[in-house]
Amino acid sequence: FGTGASLIAQELSEKLGVPVYDKAYIEHELDGDSYATEAEVIKGLAEYPCIILGRCASEILKDQPNVFNVYVCADKEDRIERIMKKESLSHDEAKEMLEKNDAERADYYYENTGKVWGDVNNYHMILDTTKLGIENCADILIRYFERVEII
């Protein structure tokens, strides 16, 4: 939240021609089928090339071929600034929202995987948008996917 991951995903989606699925989309899919679990929805989406943001997809899809897990991070102040702009909030409001969201994400990830959210061992690549910038992060991923012929 506030790292720019959704912006990177959108840029990749446009350049690679693959859809992006986020929390809202996955929750919408669950509403349509009361028997489906979130993991089943994510596995179904991953049968075709796509980008899945969050939702423990790194753990759910860890044994699937052609899955590449990326963790996008940024300095706390950069994240707060992005949230302030996107949500039209004060610094304190954005900071509170960020801290609440991070705590919820960490709890959700641990409850569903037994692992620590953000642990580098759960991902193939870590990208820091504070250091690299959003466009450079997207370019790094595109170059990598071209090199390993995923695209």
Language model: regions and residue ranges:
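C-terminal helical "lid" subdomain and adjoining coupling/linker elements of P-loop NTPases
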Residues: 148-151
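Conserved beta-strand scaffold positions in the cores of enzyme catalytic domains, especially
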Residues: 20, 67-69, 124-126
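Small-molecule kinase domains that catalyze NTP-dependent phosphoryl transfer to phosphate-bearing small molecules
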Residues: 36, 90-135
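Short amphipathic C-terminal alpha-helix that caps PH/PH-like domains
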Residues: 138-145
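ATP-dependent NMP and nucleoside kinases share a basic, alpha-helical "lid"
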Residues: 44-87
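Glycine-rich phosphate-binding P-loop
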Residues: 1-12
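Post-Walker A helix-loop "phosphate-sensing" segment adjacent to the P-loop in P-loop NTPases
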Residues: 13-21
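ATP-dependent small-molecule kinase phosphotransfer cores
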Residues: 24-49, 56
